[in-house]
């Protein structure tokens, strides 16, 4: 029973362990080039992660719900930012584009360093994930303080938009 959300702590631990195992396997296969998840796979994993985190927040009333927002801020804001950008630019949402922060960082690494594509992809992922890991480590110190967690969210949005503007000016490639 993979998605049995009860109030029993063992059920939540079982789910978390199963989720970590599946996520680790998918990550390993993806890094080895044996599987490509694409946007649909990323959205599916995000859905399951979101369900678990919302349930976790609901069952732990002493932890600020803004902690969950901090944990999910990057993919949620990336999607929201892309939707607003595409609406403003009048581009179709179902067509791929290369105007995402991760693609600008990729172009930066490609232009500034002489790495092969696998190293560039790995470096781009490492930069974004390391930043988010640092944010998570800081946020965990304030799990009971909604005010601090809101400040962290606002600062992250500011950093994201600033980085986006900087990298877009310098490293946007033609679509």
Positions of predicted regions on the chain:
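Alpha-helical transmembrane segments
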Residues: 1-175
